[in-house]
């Protein structure tokens, strides 16, 4: 958040989903790795505005082949595109994972298909209750229509409904499992998870997706205790990116220390 700034390099108008207002600043897209015991930030990108109308201040001109040039070009791309780029870079660096977890903001069919086809990674994510249609029993239905047509599980089951669908986009398709669960904050409402690994159980899908909460804890720690927002107030885009990397390094040291002090049996796994 740089609401009072005017000359910050690559500064843009970004939508704050908490206050439901536009603010001046950046969106920090973060890729992290977790084994269920520890969370480590892997990479990030400070996203500016994809559209010129939302760009407040431009950036310095660099050769597009240089790191500074590539970083600025990346900041102007869509978050879904940058997410795939960060995952590809992490895999090229030797950082592997079994599943990619993300919320409904990134769960478009195109993104899920791209991760499976290009990166060979299965996805477990929250889905939007949008008009996006999926192949189900020979028909094209959205999640609301699928939910309304099926009988729900009763009692204290961890999920309400589980169905197999086909995620389709641009002539390509991918089998997936949709798991409908109760919304704890609104008992009459429901949420839907998707997994492209249809071999695992519904309980396992719910358990694995719960690990995504680690990144929310990470954001809270960085903002509240590691001075992510207020320590650096300069105008250089490169310096801001470096500051974020320093904050991430601080969190990594804390994460390793916590692992060694609290869970001796997992030291050799890190």
Region roles according to the model:
Residues 3-5, 41-42, 110, 134-135, ...:
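Short helix/loop capping segments that flank catalytic or ligand/cofactor-binding pockets
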Residues 1-50:
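Active-site-proximal, Lys/Arg-enriched surface segment
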Residues 59-185, 265-269:
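An internal, acidic/charged active-site-proximal segment
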Residues 1, 202-233:
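Short amphipathic alpha-helical "interface-anchor" segments enriched in bulky aromatics
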Residues 178-200:
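Charge-patterned, long linear interaction tracts outside catalytic cores
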Residues 1-3, 31, 100-106, 123, ...:
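Short, conserved catalytic/metal-binding motifs centered on acidic residues
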Residues 44, 50-67:
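Short acidic, low-complexity segments enriched in Ser/Thr/Gly/Pro
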Residues 228-270:
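Basic, amphipathic alpha-helical segments enriched in Lys/Arg and hydrophobic/aromatic residues
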